[in-house]
Amino acid sequence: VIDWINAELNKSGNASSLYQKLEHPDYGNLVNHEKLFSGEIKTKPFSPARLWRTSPNVFDNIKSNYGGDARSIRQPFLVEDRKGIKEYANLLFADSAVVDVLLVNAGYCADQLIQKGQIYKDIASQKSAPTRDQLEVAASQHFKKVVFRDPTKEELKNYIALFTGSAKEGIHSEALRVMLMAIMMHPESVYRIEIGLGESDTSGRRMLSSTELAFAISYAITDRHPDSILLKAAESGKLRTKDEVHAQISRMLEDESIEKPRILRFFQEFFGYNQAHIVFKDEARSGGFSYYGENYPVIYERDADFFVLNILEKDKDVFKQMLTSDEYFILNRQTFRNTVFDFYEQNKELIDKGQLTEEKSKELLKRLGLKNWKELNKKYYLHGFDRGFNGSPEVIKKIGKEIPTEGRIDNRNKDKSYQVISQGMHTLYQKYPMAYDLKDGEQNFLLPQPYKRPNRAGMLTHPAWLIAHSLNDISDPIRRGKWIRQRLLAGVVLDVPITVDATIPEDHHKTLRERLSVTEAKACWRCHEQMNPLGYSFEIFDDFGRFRTIETLDKLPMVNGKFHSKPVDSRGVLAGTGEKNIDGDVKDALELIHKMANSDKVRQSIIRHVFRYYMGRNEMLSDSITLIAADKAYLESGGSFNALLISLLTSDSFLYRKTLTKE
């Protein structure tokens, strides 16, 4: 039937819009989930031949190679800050706006190189025509820094011809500038070339060449160009088989010195918790959501990062732990100060004498979860007066716990020595733990962490996720339910018709769930049935992420100093997993989450999103073999994300390209 529909659409000429929709991030779930994982599809997987625009993160890491002050080089490769996976290859182009910025950057860098680079200064200033050797060295040197490979003979010939043609007026500096700018505008400095320059097979697929693979692997795992080991493997012909690719990916994943920010970024984009800071919260309701530039939702996002990283470090049952773990990190600025003070209390005699053994210094680093002191500022987002802390006895003595009860206090004595203040929590931080259901002074944020928290289960009950998926002054059952339906249950929710008024009716005497009963009308329920029963279960949390059993009706006048309230109704329904022992009624979000964590469909749905992130596109039915193998690798490894990643990055979907024709 599907094949017949496709044939009829092709005949009518309306197929192109459908194909375009299937390629968009919002419509990946239109590809049938059951068919993808049934095993009935035997087509050899591949990705379409493509150019994938350079990532803004990669550009930030390599722009220092271009010449000039990296701070003056503008970011050309902006990506829409949308929820979900952002970088799809087919949606990113070097349009006129991108090219304009690239040209400005190229001109600036060329000018800087001519002013400061001796080889370029010599060519620009000499009266006689530069030799071919001079031009080849100049072009090759800049080319390698920009494109990360040696230019071919043909490329060198073209650049020298460009210089020669531009130098007819005898102005060598301008001709050199044109040549250097042309190098910076090389397609490989703008796009990742993934057209399949390797060997072809009988099905019309072409394997990525060794060079294409080196860049594809590096940009899949890191935000940097290939390291010397990967480039050497490509140049020596040792990146042509799956086993050779497997060896390089395993090496990079196991090497702790190689930063792998893209792994964390997947979970940020998948869960969307890194959007918490853009949801406005009224200060009168929150009691203050920032202090000295410290935006609490931003700190919650950082806490969530550590929640993710802790699970990834263990690399066991990763998806289940992401959904169910009750171990949370609470890492605001006081975490650092309080832990250092606690360390001081335990080692006071030694520190007061200015003595601290290497063993004790390592103990403090370990408690703070640091490899060295250089990591400190980045990890704990410190106040200016804490930056530069180096673990010496002198600076440890200057750390005191602050417990002002009224306003601020000066915790220094007249001789400017620091007074150590006894146990307690800075009152200005008492608003921060409210989202973790902590009472004032309940605990002091000491490290090491994590802390177990009651009434919580994984990322979907983390304050960062709950705030990110809320509205300005209310929770958001509809969008929370839609997120679960699409991200975890591979479901499709239709767009809101333009004729529908989606405004929630105001009634200050009703709870939000009661007000949303209008969506249960027959005309609305067809779509809302996919979302509301899932989202309602999260009504045990308010829009700040605080656990609750009653909903405060704070728009009504107070009575005897208190707002009216009603009990929370968090009953919901899980439907759509296709698993009889999992689908059914749930009393709240905690029961819902634990049920979903045991679902095959939920696990497979997450794997589909991992695929989209690393392949830069939606899956096709022809990717069935890849997805089934990835699911198998994940299960057989005990839930290892690294094993899943290796399976995907050594799959035919990653290694092979094919030119698609939409007939």
Predicted regions and their residues:
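Low-complexity, glycine/serine/threonine/alanine-rich intrinsically disordered linker
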Residues: V1-E663
